[in-house]
């Protein structure tokens, strides 16, 4: 049985699983779908064409599915899609997409979104991501699986943050952070490989060693980016556990539009 507080407003048309819990004074819009066992905190607003999966916990005063902060937006029925088992803490804001991009903002599974985080229009957040309190994502930002974004950080529009990367607190990021790399500062600069995070996630010693070698080629040996990429491709043919992550690193760099931090 759905547990909806008598002061909450669920507009006609909303599709709410019978196991969902909705707290006092929450507002659920007519185009919202909420999956099983999700809880919505008091005073939260879930609006727009928003789909929320199962087992999510949304804290009080969150604003989910709001209009994009984009002056080109003209009330198009763009979307927000949220996966399963996410924690979205109080006062977080997540906006729908725009037609200038794919028209959808996405948040995957098992993410930990702390208080006052902003996820702008057309962002694509993967799985197992941690966004610390007051981290601010501008529009069109992409964040790979297992990335960690420190509190009070700002990420420029269209920036990409690779899988297993880490951005330190109070950083200003204006270019892409390659996978596995730690970045910090204003403006953010590279500070090594996220070794501890990789160990916790089961990366082998050989894979971590290969990524450390890749980091030296990219940042420590005085090579141009093209020279470094050539040597990285050679490193990725070594035949060990490091081949796949080094290849992922090269593919990320090749796809960069804003350039990587250097």
From Swiss-Prot:
Entry-linked Pfam families: Acetyltransf_11, Hexapep
Domain of life according to the entry: Bacteria
Pathway participation: Glycolipid biosynthesis; lipid IV(A) biosynthesis; lipid IV(A) from (3R)-3-hydroxytetradecanoyl-[acyl-carrier-protein] and UDP-N-acetyl-alpha-D-glucosamine: step 1/6
SUPFAM superfamilies, A to Z: Trimeric LpxA-like enzymes (SSF51161)
EC id: 2.3.1.129
Catalytic reactions on record: a (3R)-hydroxyacyl-[ACP] + UDP-N-acetyl-alpha-D-glucosamine = a UDP-3-O-[(3R)-3-hydroxyacyl]-N-acetyl-alpha-D-glucosamine + holo-[ACP]
Cell location: Cytoplasm
An annotated GO cellular component: cytoplasm
Main location: cytoplasm
GO term, biological process aspect, one: lipid A biosynthetic process
Claim: Repeat is one of the keywords in the record: yes
Disulfide bond annotation, renumbered to this chain: none
Catalytic class of the enzyme: transferase
UniProt GO molecular function: acyl-[acyl-carrier-protein]-UDP-N-acetylglucosamine O-acyltransferase activity
Keyword annotations from UniProtKB, A to Z: Acyltransferase, Cytoplasm, Lipid A biosynthesis, Lipid biosynthesis, Lipid metabolism, Repeat, Transferase
Subunit structure as annotated in this protein's UniProt entry: Homotrimer.
Function of the protein: Involved in the biosynthesis of lipid A, a phosphorylated glycolipid that anchors the lipopolysaccharide to the outer membrane of the cell.
Family of the protein in this entry: Belongs to the transferase hexapeptide repeat family. LpxA subfamily.
Protein name (Swiss-Prot/TrEMBL): Acyl-[acyl-carrier-protein]--UDP-N-acetylglucosamine O-acyltransferase
């Amino acid at each position: 049985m759905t547990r909806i507080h008598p002061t909450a407003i669920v507009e006609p048309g909303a599709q709410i699983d019978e196991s969902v819990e909705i707290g006092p004074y929450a507002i659920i819009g007519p185009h919202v779908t909420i999956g099983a066992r999700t809880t919505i905190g008091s005073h939260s607003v879930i609006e727009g064409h928003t789909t929320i999966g199962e087992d999510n916990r949304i804290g009080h005063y969150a604003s989910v599915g709001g209009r994009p902060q984009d002056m080109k937006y003209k009330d198009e029925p763009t979307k927000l899609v949220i996966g399963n088992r996410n924690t979205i803490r109080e006062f977080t804001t997540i906006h729908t997409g725009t037609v200038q991009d794919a028209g959808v903002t996405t948040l995957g599974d098992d993410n930990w979104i702390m208080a006052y985080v902003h996820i702008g229009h057309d962002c694509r957040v993967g799985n197992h991501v941690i966004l610390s309190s007051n981290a601010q994502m501008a529009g069109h930002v992409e964040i790979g699986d297992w990335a960690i974004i420190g509190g009070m950080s700002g990420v420029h529009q269209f920036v990409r943050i690779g899988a297993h990367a880490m951005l330190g607190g109070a950083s200003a990021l204006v270019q892409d952070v390659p996978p596995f790399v730690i970045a910090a500062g204003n403006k953010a600069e590279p500070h090594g490989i996220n070794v501890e995070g990789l160990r916790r996630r089961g990366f082998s010693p050989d894979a971590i060693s290969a990524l450390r070698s890749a980091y030296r080629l990219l940042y420590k040996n005085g090579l141009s980016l093209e020279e470094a990429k050539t040597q990285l491709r050679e490193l990725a043919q070594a035949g060990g556990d490091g081949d796949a992550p080094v290849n992922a690193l090269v593919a990320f760099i090749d796809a960069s539009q804003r350039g990587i931090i250097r």
